[in-house]
From Swiss-Prot:
Pyrophosphatase that catalyzes the hydrolysis of nucleoside triphosphates to their monophosphate derivatives, with a high preference for the non-canonical purine nucleotides XTP (xanthosine triphosphate), dITP (deoxyinosine triphosphate) and ITP. Seems to function as a house-cleaning enzyme that removes non-canonical purine nucleotides from the nucleotide pool, thus preventing their incorporation into DNA/RNA and avoiding chromosomal lesions. This is dITP/XTP pyrophosphatase. Its EC number is 3.6.1.66. It is an enzyme of class 3 (hydrolase). GO terms for biological process: nucleotide metabolic process; purine nucleoside triphosphate catabolic process. The lineage of its organism: Bacteria, Pseudomonadati, Spirochaetota, Spirochaetia, Spirochaetales.
Length: 201
């Protein structure tokens, strides 16, 4: 059994990552009350900030990784971007529910013809011997015209993101989503690396 520490407290991300990695011999450990300010200007910088913070907390003696992801919309100058999680406070200086944040995006995109957008996921890994590696995944699509009120799956902006198959991410099961999503792509790359390195020793 190998142990790997994940610098997050986001339950939705944890569930997706466990499903994608699907490694019975991997003990994925999530720290309690882990909180760090995302001061980076890119997804890569933020994922590395998280990984470095957890690496330090664990006395630089464990394999760790951080992840940062978000939605980038062409017509909004690639916003919400790195502010995806906190776009409500960034844009309106107040907290909104998930549906309200989605509606905020739709309102900003009202009458906008260019609806191209993409989700990006960036992973930063730090090994016990201080090796730093980065993995990234992107899924391109469009912003829908309306909210998916009867969504069955997903979280965050999934209910307003249309894939190339004209399906919203929130219409897909977790398994279906993880085959094509930004997180699925990035963590599939990460899994290949882990199988070759961590589980080959």
């Amino acid at each position: 059994m190998k142990t790997l520490f994940f610098a997050t407290t986001n339950e939705n991300k944890i569930n997706e990552v466990k499903n994608i990695l699907d490694m019975p011999n991997l003990n994925l450990v999530v720290p309690k009350n882990f909180n760090i300010k995302e001061t980076g200007t890119t997804f890569k910088e933020n994922s590395l900030l998280k990984a470095k913070a957890l690496f330090a907390i664990l006395n630089k003696n464990q394999n760790v990784f951080g992840e940062d992801s978000g939605l980038c919309i062409e017509a909004l100058n690639l916003e919400p971007g790195i502010y995806s999680k906190r776009y409500d406070t960034y844009k309106l200086c107040k907290k909104l529910s998930t549906n309200e944040k989605n509606q905020l995006i739709l309102d900003l995109m009202k009458n906008e013809k260019n609806r191209k957008a993409y989700f990006i996921c960036n992973i930063s890994y730090i090994s016990k011997d201080r090796q730093i590696l980065n993995f990234e995944g992107i899924i391109k699509g469009e912003i829908a015209l309306s909210l998916n009120d009867d969504k069955n799956y997903g979280f965050g902006y999934d209910s307003i993101f249309l894939t190339k198959n004209n399906k919203k991410l929130s219409d897909l099961t977790l398994e279906e989503k993880n085959k094509i999503s930004h997180r699925g792509i990035a963590f599939s790359k990460f899994k290949k690396f882990l199988l070759k390195s961590l589980f080959n020793n």
